[in-house]
Amino acid sequence: MRIKILIIVLFINSCSYPEIIRDELVYDNDFETKSLLNIDGGGFKKFNNSTVLGDFNNDGFTIHLDNVGDHEYVFVSFDLYIHGTWDGNFNGFSENDKADKWSIELKPDMDLHKNLSSEIFTTTFSNSPCWPNYCLRQSYPQTYPAENNPKKGSFTTDIGDKLCNESFFGGPSTLYKIEKGFQSRGDAVVLRFYDELYQPNAIDKNGIPQEKCDESWSIDNIKIRVISYK
């Protein structure tokens, strides 16, 4: 009987989770003070009764954090606003069609050392309606090119009016509350947030490009934690 008990105890101990020895918040920015500390790129705007970083269109920003100390994982959480008429995995063009992609990338300038499966998260978003005969699907909450219905995983939909009230282009926004983790080593954390939007038809009747009015994104409430295990 004692042998059986010992075997059970050893089995339970062998299946226990690693002990967390460090879980530290190293960055926290809600942008209400309009601080660009540790940020390269971007400006501010008021949206949804808050100050946000954005809006971006075929653009992005980078967070550089030094002296964060030894760690094994980095976790980033944030509020992401998808503005306007994002089309997800397909824009519906018969030739040279492309997705509306959005990415977070760890250590974006170190391509020779990347394990792309763990150091970049690329997905798509769609604010399209979804009818039986028309539905431009998105990848989120999975990575591209997975297919899910528009706005899946969202926190709030149909927020506000167009960002450009006088423009034909654009539409309401969708809010996603996102957390992503990456394996990370060293004393620094560098994270790049960016999009790759495809909008060949975002041109008004006067021939003036309207890409940013048509589709863009903003971000708020960024928190970054580093974690180590025993």
Give the ranges of each region predicted by the language model.
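Short edge-strand/loop segments of extracellular domains
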Residues: F93-H113
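Extended extracellular/luminal ectodomain segments enriched in beta-structured repeat modules
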Residues: V68-F78, I82-G84, R185-V190
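Sec-dependent N-terminal signal peptides
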Residues: K4-N13
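Extracellular carbohydrate-recognition regions
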Residues: C15-G43, D111-P129, N133, K230
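Short beta-strands within extracellular/lumenal beta-sheet-rich domains
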Residues: D55-S77, N96, D100-W102, P172-K180, ...
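Extended, low-complexity, turn-rich repeat/linker tracts enriched in Gly/Pro/Ser/Thr and Asp/Glu
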Residues: H71, Y81-K98, P129-W131, Q199-A202
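Terminal, low-complexity interaction segments
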Residues: S139-K230
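Short carbohydrate-recognition loop motifs
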Residues: D40-D59
